[in-house]
């Protein structure tokens, strides 16, 4: 079939789909990934919270120790976070964020019996936070976080793929009737890691990464309901921009067009630890990374979800006589660039760091001003809809 015919059919299919309401909000089945990315604005992570765990190498199913009385709150707070309150989430929405990323270690409270059965109490606690964030009008992104790394390092590929399918099936079924503001992100930073004691060639590694993402998409779609058209985020190779923009990384095939994003993390650690933040090389590196993503994904109709990017730059890590001086100025620089490239920037944050979960506000007034300005600019930016549905639908497929 010619590309033009496929694209015409795909566009007609999308336009004919009705919007469907559900008990917890609206499911717009005609919502495309690019439109969703625009609506997601600026985001923040609920970091060191539901992805927190105490490792247990002897537990081959959960990979985690039992903490305290084995309640969800024991794990939610084990890395220093406070219990997530309604007021905390209200403050996130009021600060101008449009997206809350909730990383989750699903092995917490899981029995070591090889069934990979998620704890009903644990997923119910995650659901409480998701419900509150959705009620506040936020997009919510949940994933498999750190648990993917445990599985990959301790089990052979086929067992990992089966376990991932089992875990994602449970998550997807729990949230199958949720609205389109709930987005699933497959994994965190572990794709590309081999099992301990083994080695993979470059081609084998990319194949493993691609199989993991395909298993995620296939599993979620098979649960039906609103998941049949939900926006999904495929995770990059280590979420590394250089590795993920390589042609060997393939976006998963999907049963519906234009419902996929790709996830990477903006990591400028080398400049941070070499005390080069704010200099010309740091600025050029940031631009070069954005250009790689634009050429590989955005220009091909695939939105880029930057699931973690730096929120605070300490003064001691700046270059002498920086061109971009001060943490808030660097934040402005990175968020402005993300907005210009139409990426979804999500700040990495932990308890009482950038955003205070006890005071329920952004800790710095100058940082708050940056978030307000960038969020407003994204919201007011004219968006014309699907830029390249045809290329996206045919991306990495034989025609």
Predicted regions and their residues:
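Surface-exposed, active-site-proximal loop segments in enzymatic domains
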Residues: 106-124, 146-162, 192-201, 276-277, ...
């Amino acid at each position: 079939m010619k590309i033009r015919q496929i694209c015409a059919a795909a566009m007609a299919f999308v336009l004919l789909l009705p919007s469907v309401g559900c008990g917890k909000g609206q499911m717009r089945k005609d919502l495309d990934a690019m439109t969703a990315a625009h609506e997601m604005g600026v985001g923040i992570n609920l970091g060191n919270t539901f992805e927190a765990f105490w490792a247990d190498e002897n537990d081959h199913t959960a990979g985690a120790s039992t903490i305290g009385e084995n309640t969800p709150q024991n794990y939610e707070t084990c890395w220093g976070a406070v219990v997530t309150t309604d007021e905390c989430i209200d403050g996130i929405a009021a600060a101008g964020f449009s997206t809350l990323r909730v990383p989750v270690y699903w092995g917490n409270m899981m029995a070591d019996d090889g069934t990979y059965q998620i704890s009903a109490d644990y997923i119910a606690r995650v659901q409480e936070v998701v419900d509150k964030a959705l009620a506040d009008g936020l997009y919510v992104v949940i994933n498999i976080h750190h648990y993917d790394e445990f599985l990959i390092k301790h089990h052979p590929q086929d067992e990992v793929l089966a376990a991932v399918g089992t875990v994602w099936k449970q998550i997807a079924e729990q949230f199958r009737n949720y609205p389109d503001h709930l987005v699933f992100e497959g994994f965190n930073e572990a794709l590309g890691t081999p099992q301990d004691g083994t080695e993979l060639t470059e081609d084998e590694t990319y194949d493993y990464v691609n199989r993991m993402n395909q298993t995620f998409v296939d599993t979620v779609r098979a649960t039906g309901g609103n998941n049949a058209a939900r926006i999904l985020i495929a995770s990059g190779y280590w979420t590394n921009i250089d590795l993920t923009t390589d042609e060997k990384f393939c976006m998963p095939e999907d049963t519906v067009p234009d419902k996929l994003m790709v996830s990477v993390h903006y990591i400028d650690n080398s400049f941070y630890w070499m005390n080069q933040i704010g200099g010309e090389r740091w600025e050029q590196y940031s631009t070069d990374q954005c250009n790689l993503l634009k050429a590989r994904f955005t220009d091909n109709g695939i939105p880029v979800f930057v699931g973690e990017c730096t929120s605070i730059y300490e003064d001691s890590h700046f270059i002498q006589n920086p061109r971009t001086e001060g943490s808030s100025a660097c934040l402005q620089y990175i968020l402005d660039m993300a907005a210009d490239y139409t990426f979804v920037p999500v700040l990495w944050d932990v308890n009482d760091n950038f955003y205070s979960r006890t005071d329920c506000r952004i800790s710095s007034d100058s940082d708050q001003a940056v978030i307000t300005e960038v969020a407003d600019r994204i919201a007011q930016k004219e968006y014309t809809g699907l830029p390249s549905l045809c290329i996206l639908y045919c991306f990495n497929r034989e025609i």
